Amino acid sequence: MMIEPLYDFSLTAEQEARARTLHESSIILDMLFQGPVGTYSLPEGAEEELLALAQEACPGDEIAQCNWATAEILRRMIGVSYSQLYKDCWYDSGLTGGCRQLSVTDRDEALRSAVELQAEFDTYPWLVKCTSVEQIRRCKKEGLKAGIVTSQEAEGYSKDLKLLELLYNYGLRVQQLSYNNQNLIGADCMEPNGGAGLSKFGIRFVEKCNELGIVVDTGHCGYHTTMDACKYSKAPVIASHTGVEKVNFHARCKSDDEIRAIADTGGVVGIFAMPWFTGADPENTTVDDFIDHIDYVVRLVGIDHVGIGTDWPMPQTKWAAITFKKYVAPTIGFAPGNGPSTEWIHGLKDYRSFINVTRGLVARGYSDEAIRKILGENWLRVFEQVWKK
């Protein structure tokens, strides 16, 4: 439960004070927010307790034990036992808001997921399902937290645009076109040679997102699907959580062409904090490496087109993360050796360390206005342009 020490940026006392003021006063949004509770903020003894309970519930089945433990953490976060932990971790992070994810692997799962997510909103009076920028700004002003409903999966739509309308009416405001596998819309980044572009249905899907006011997200999309999304969308396109190929070459990172195409739509590239995608050595990746990706996007396309989408850490135990990486990740499109595990970015081990992002941006010499844009204002500009009033 201990928060890691502040990362050493060698800031002066004046810079530390400036970073603290910026962190407290800015709207900070994480558009792939897996928190607020992560692996290293679980209560003392939780690892052992959850392992014993998972083994009892799912004897002899490591994958089932992993899934059970992760689901149990989520149950506890909307129950009594972790409710205070959930609130404390979110408020200690300084984040104004972040995504709350729907699972759209099929229609039934989408509806089940919506019920589960609604329970999260209903449990916490300080957590607001936000569908407008005005609501997000009000959350900041009133000391509340903003939940933005998003989905990474799109295979569950099949060719059912009515399901997209249904989920929009529920509150969905950001939709990724593909995860780690090809679907009827387009291709993921793990397909060879950049995968296929948008299908005819995929073009209609993008047009429907534009019509409804749903942000088109290309975070996991392959090269050609990303480029097509930018070509056919009449509204800003984002990559909610990705990295820069020129900083760390990996399939999950975007090329200069993709970053430029997203920026040309008026969109934003969100930088993730996943150690095995961010730096060459996952064991020794730091918040400085994370900020290197931000710096590159700023140099390439300007300060208005970069944001944050950490995607890490996950709300799971260390042993479940190891099991997930070994057995589950390969089944959902991750390359061998990739996927959630026990590594962390030094300086971002926990969401409660999020001030290190602001401190790092101060250390790199960004102005107050630029830092506020990176932390959240760029996302808000896109939402203002896309979301219907």
Name each model feature, range by range.
Residues 1-193, 249-389:
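N-terminal hydrophobic targeting/anchoring segments and the immediately downstream early-domain regions
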Residues 155-158, 166-253:
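Divalent metal-binding pocket/active-site signature
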